[in-house]
Amino acid sequence: MTTQWEEYESELRAGDADRVNAVVDEIREMDIIERTEAFEGCFGGATDLYRSHEDGYVRQSCVRVVQQFAPRLPAAVTLQSSDVASPPAETVHDQTDAVCGFLLEAITDEDGRVRQSAKRALKDCIRAYDALEETATIEGLIEELETMAAGASGKQAQHLREAKEDAEFFMQSGLGRIIEGFQKEFGDALDS
């Protein structure tokens, strides 16, 4: 009998967009508890496949799958409600930390598609940390991304700086976020 990860792995190794998207969609449709439980059997396999595969699309697919397994904002929010089933807080923290650590590796990948996927996925981790009120963790992440960007060049440095800016955004007050988001969305239109 094949495990859930073995099924996913064969789809990811195929490098076919439709098959990869089906895996991503299947994980996305899991409820929080299912996803948290599946994480244990799939995270290590996805990160191992990422590290061992030469094909950038397969590595990007691994990042996308890991992003779906991340506890993310809904898990952090359900921790604050006794009316909704949620995984243990320690599990949410541990899994978010594991995903974030992997994404810091993936955001330095030689393939720009992989870096872009990792940058998007990092936003989910940052949102979860924000909901968990883990400001020290976000501050540490900002420092790490700054250090990584200083040691990188070209597009890789740009992607690291952009990820750092995303993290800095979450350190602002709620009003500051609204204003900055508004400026990013409509800034050029306001200047005319």
Question: Model-derived features: where do they sit?
Answer:
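N-terminal "cap/leader" segments of large eukaryotic alpha-helical scaffolds
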Residues: 1-25, 182-190
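Eukaryotic acidic, Ser/Thr-rich intrinsically disordered low-complexity regions
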Residues: 4, 149-192
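Buried hydrophobic core positions in alpha-solenoid tandem helical repeats
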Residues: 8-9, 42-48, 88, 102-104, ...
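Alpha-solenoid helical repeat architecture
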Residues: 12-15, 50-54, 106-110, 149
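Positions within the helices of HEAT/ARM-like alpha-solenoid repeats
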Residues: 18-22, 54-59, 113-115, 152-160
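Alpha-solenoid helical repeat scaffolds
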Residues: 22, 61, 65, 102, ...
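Structural signature of alpha-helical solenoid repeat scaffolds
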Residues: 25-29, 67-71, 123-127, 165
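Flexible loop/turn segments at the boundaries of HEAT repeats in alpha-solenoid HEAT proteins
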Residues: 31-40, 70-93, 127-137, 170-176
